Amino acid sequence: MPELLAPAGNFISLRAVLENGADAVYFGLDEYNMRANAKNFSIDDLAKISNISKDYGAKTYLCTNIILKELQINALKDNLEKIASSEIDGLILSDIGLIEDTVSHGLEAHISVQENVTNSLTLKTLHKLGAKRAILSRELSIDEITEITRKSPIETEIFIHGAMCMAISGRCFLSYGLYGRSANCGDCLQPCRKNWTLTFEESQNDAVLNTSDVLEESFVISSSYDDTYRTNFFSPKDMCMIGHIPELIKTGVSSFKIEGRARSPDYGAMVTGVYREAIDSYLSNPDEYEFNPKWTEELESVFNRGFDTGFYFDIPFETSETNQSKYIKKDIGQVVNYYNKVKVAELRIWDDLKIGDEIMIQGETTGSITHTIDSMQIEGEDVKEVSKNSNVGVLLPHKVRKNDFVYKLIERSQQ
């Protein structure tokens, strides 16, 4: 059974993915990881992360996957004893120079996708150095993954959902070249997600069409700096493999990884929950397994750039034209109290709320839950809607906590 590995950028996200079935979580510190712009944890948070995760029977992996220069690698090496004392399970490394020290401190050494592992010979070498697992390159096909995993002496891990990079294994210099902010040190400003115009100065024609027979649609190269043809051709769609769970499991890989430490708790909750349901459905009865279209609909409801299967079955060419979730989260209140015996939450609402509205409640202990309002009371009287600045009781089967945040989910099509 493959491990379902989910991202955690903060304690709310951590709880959200664990509540929705993550077998393991990965996270970064303020330094040493590829999401420097995300809200990361401090080294003093590691013991708390470990303890919370153990309550769910989940493993914990710390990302240290940037390019480490001399001062940084020595600082990280000096911190290994403190990291190990927190009782997390392992480190995700992009520098093989740390494998020996990581293992000597009782931590598993997992090799990052930034190492661009694309063959079994590399895996055999990593095994000799002491690595327990390697994340395979995103640029491999499903057949290549199956063959590599079959020959590998260590565990393999693959990405199954989330953002894809235009550069091989994320080794991009575009952000550094334009802004002096290095993607390889976790500080990418993602200029690839912007619209671009490609110019072809040698051409005598104002518009030159590419002549590749691989692309389904031609793109335009302008020679006159005319931004009529501006597009986001550097921006790939998000990977989504929810329609291919049986094929993924048959590869024999040990871990399925969801990308998204910089994304919201509701993203982590939804994506983790959907893949958990699909994986469990297949494993419970492989012969009778059927793909459920609602899984795709649910994944589309949270932030995405459109979906693609990456390199699993072919070379991807489609670029993302979308950059949003199905819903807008509107901050409408906070939890005042939760009455466990009657399953009622008292909410302080500073916006309109009515029967049929879909809400989301998030908190460090609660994680992220969604609920459709089907019953509300004010001072013991049933109401169908409430106005701003009201305290209202809502029948809620999920336990929530005081000061949890309350959001109303509004479809973008209604805006």
What is the role of each PLM region?
Residues 131:
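Residues lining hydrophobic/aromatic ligand-binding pockets adjacent to catalytic sites
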Residues 1-117, 121, 136-139, 143-257, ...:
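Active-site pocket-lining/capping segments in soluble small-molecule metabolic enzymes
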